[in-house]
Amino acid sequence: MTDDRSTDERRTADRDFEVDLDDVLDDEDDDEGLFDDLLSGEPIFENKEVLRPSYTPHELPHRNDQINNMATILVAALRGETPSNILIYGKTGTGKTASAKFVSQELEKTSKKYDVPCEVEYINCEVTDTQYRVLAQLANTFIDQNRAFVDARIADLSDLRAQADDDPNALEIGGSPGDDRTGNESSEGSDVSDSFSDLRERFDSVAEIDDRIDSLEADKAEMEQVPMTGWPTDRVYATFFDAVDYVERVAVIMLDEIDKLVEKSGDDTLYNLSRMNSELDNSRVSIIGISNDLKFTDFLDPRVKSSLGEEEIVFPPYDANQLRDILQHRSDVAFKADALSDDVLPLCAAFAAQEHGDARRALDLLRTAGELAERDQAENVTEDHVRRAQDKIELDRVVEVVRTLPTQSKLVLYAILLLEDNGVHNVNTGEVYNIYKTLCDELDADVLTQRRVTDLISELDMLGIVNAVVVSKGRYGRTKEISLSVPVEETEAVLEADSRLSDIEDITPFVQARFENN
């Protein structure tokens, strides 16, 4: 009996446990997690990615003339000829890069259609900003393509060899790509150029096929990737040269922000790239340079300037109506139906038109407004979201500009901020200089002359961080009255995030120094 009761008790306990477990699971289902509430709202975006700068649209409103001009120049590549080099100018957000990428995609698509070996390699010179890095990136790209080509060629030859083992007459038909070294599609589906598939070579024996395979494998073994540092530049260039010339191709090299490369590394890269065609045997190279600075060629060697700037295309700023058209095209894809109130696109276009017709700014503004609306779990994007987005973007811009200022400019700005933060407004250059000198002494930094500090204040004024106005003091002459144009709290946080400026603890003595020379 004792054992039976124990069994019954265990069964009852098991049933009780099952009920309790079910209750726990029900409670967990009812309990909303961190993201459940955020996901409960109706999404506003259909495809947010089309509003990002990295997206290349299928249509570029108001840029047909520039696109057709580029296509007219680059069509030479599809005839196996060397296209003229192109320099593209225009301010930020005028569609330069998007248009060039659009034309490049069309060029590569058409080259595949007609089996012409042509490819476009894009380099952002704001990131890849030295001759070594540019040449290394290009060399490694072409080395990868050449390895894929060799693998495809070896696979074809191996197939032919297998056929010859079964039937010696197979050698009479040919069946392998030949020594005219142009690419093919590899057995793995890797797209190397299709143009060599019609070129054949004849083999008299299986031994000749084996020799050809050995030769290709030796080629591949010599295709060494360039490390991102450590080699002499002339070795990097030689590796790039051999890689681009290994197969027959027209290579269009697109250098975005080309002025940043020249500014940091000089024009040696452009000199080498623009003059290498005279030494190439199999390939041809063309350059597309994209710049925000219409005057950057003034700093080039005359020989580089003449060969690089064979064709020039200028992208003018968009006006408000054109920006509205661009926003309409993108918003149709980016947002759910009826997600935007009627005044959103005109307001985004108007704000961006004030920023020299910057389409990138307009798209960024529209995307940010949509994100703010989603965070509010609003049903629509409204004018208020656009205005808040404008404030947020402007603050983000200021933070980034301040963060990247040179140390001396930060010290000058910090001196102005300390005065404003302690109730001293519309200060003059002398007052700022007194505080600046004290800060330099505190941090053991070099002290610039007052004339140089005045220049730094003018630079901060041009960046929109301070407002410096020349005012007349009558018989005392003229002076600059300086005030902050950015939020004090956010600016102070960015400056104090600098490891050197964060060492300053007590600001009171610095403000008091303002009165020492009065």
UniProtKB/Swiss-Prot annotation:
The keyword Nucleotide-binding applies. GO terms for biological process: DNA replication. ATP binds at residues 94-98, 318, 330. Residues 186-196 have a biased composition (Low complexity). Residues 165-196 are annotated as: Disordered. SMART domains: AAA (SM00382), Cdc6_C (SM01074). Keywords: ATP-binding, DNA replication, Nucleotide-binding. Pfam families: AAA_16, Cdc6_C, Cdc6_lid. One of its GO terms (molecular function) is ATP hydrolysis activity. Disruption phenotype: Not essential for normal growth. Belongs to the CDC6/cdc18 family. PANTHER family: CELL DIVISION CONTROL PROTEIN 6-RELATED, ORC1-TYPE DNA REPLICATION PROTEIN. Involved in regulation of DNA replication. Required to initiate DNA replication of the circular chromosome at a nearby autonomously replicating sequence (ARS) oriC1. HAMAP family: ORC1_type_DNA_replic_protein. This is ORC1-type DNA replication protein 7. The lineage of its organism: Archaea, Methanobacteriati, Methanobacteriota, Stenosarchaea group, Halobacteria.
